[in-house]
Amino acid sequence: MTVGDKEELSDDIVETYSVSGASHVLALSGLHIGFLYALLLFVLRPLWRRWRRLKPLLLLLLVLFLVSFAFFTGLSSSVVRSVIMFSLLAFAGLQPEKPLTLNTLAATAFLMLLCKPVWLFDVGFQLSFSAVAAIVLVQPKLYAFWKVDNRFLRYLWGLMTVSMAAQLGTAPLVIFYFSRFSTHFLLTNLWVIPMVSLVLYSAVFLLMLTPLPFVQHLFARVVEALVHVQNEVLRWIERLPGAAVDDIWLDIWGVLLVYLFLGMAYYGFLRLTVRRVCFALLALLAVVSWHSLSIMSNASRQGIAFYSVRGCPVVHCMADNRHSWLACADSLPDMPCLCRALSPHWNRLRLETPRLVAGDYTTSGLSMRNQIVSYAGKRICLLSDNRWRNKSSSHPLSVDYLYVSKGYQGGIEELTSLFSMGMVVLDASLSDYYQNKIANDCVRLGIPYLLLSQKGSYRILL
């Protein structure tokens, strides 16, 4: 959690944080950089109060430390955004009368995209900037609703308004990418943000105890207990009724229309007039109309699909009654990875959870034998090993699609005596060299081919 390393997190823990709405604390973001910035500020502020001329130098030292931390943690987009924002905040301390606004956020985005334009399509980049923009715009308005004199209640109200604003800004993107909305996010953030601050500061103190191994070992038990308590409460929130709404979806145009509605609603909220309310209602009508149209156009239809999910070569055979089958080229497919990647797509098509087919199988309308799938009059050969190499036939078998994935080590020409191929589909698990080699063979033999690594997915309606 301190450095954003999620390699050793179990699937149960990741799911608990996802359902409860606390996933943002697992990934390094503005929350973590903010804690680090506050700690450094606490250490350095007494020095520049005593020697004012050192303030610019100490602020520069603070910024260099933040930049070093960003390099240490891998320069993820959310960390880079946070480091730039807090660096600007630090230098703004030299002129306190100039607050940070949306202009600062826009300047940060411009600098990041200038260095790496592809960040625009990064999920972390989009979520990070949408959350901060919503906090800057919406949180002060929400906070002004209730004037609280009690210091503790004022802190809780501030925490709640920040959570509501961030959730408002990121909800459309979260639904688009993850098909999930956590309903208990307020309760989660009221618990997890104070606990994360305790855990992070305790972890920093634990590192400082390195010269004292015995004391460090004892204090490690304290940190472990804090993490355990944090996780147990999140598990309790996960088990609450209606903790998350799953299987919901938006397409890209739906996301843009929802943001248009939120923008119009905010515009009307600033000054309530009939005209502004009408604009917001029209935007809401556009959202509902588009989503209804999408549901009708994405109704379950019979077809075959190939997906670009590295390490999971499958053929998805879909019926028009919401049932479907995943014919796997690998005997041990990574189903959790496949489901995480494709659940939003399946939800949008309103499909039930597909049935896994990993060996010889026969049912009404579909059969699979020797890695050859027959479905709805189409025949697909899954080529993931060398079983068909160095073999020939006087009567080549007609296959509509030859699906080549990692494991096959031969060429295409040697298979022409076995199969009459309509199209060759190259899985993303193949190396770039091998994809180019087979693609060149297909061009030479006049066989159409498809690169899933470039296409992303390929769906055939039957």
Predicted stretch roles:
Residues 38-46, 207, 260-268:
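Hydrophobic, aromatic-rich transmembrane alpha-helices
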Residues 48-53, 92-104, 202, 268-276:
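Membrane-helix interface "capping/anchor" motifs
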Residues 61-64, 105-109, 277-286:
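Central hydrophobic cores of alpha-helical transmembrane segments
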Residues 1-85, 91, 168:
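Aromatic-rich juxtamembrane segments at the membrane interface
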Residues 295-314, 424:
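Alpha-helical transmembrane signal-anchor/signal-peptide segments
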Residues 75-259:
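Internal transmembrane alpha-helical bundles of multi-pass membrane proteins
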Residues 312-462:
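Extracytosolic and intramembrane catalytic regions of membrane-associated proteins
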Residues 153, 241-302:
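Glycine- and aromatic-enriched alpha-helical transmembrane segments of multi-pass membrane proteins
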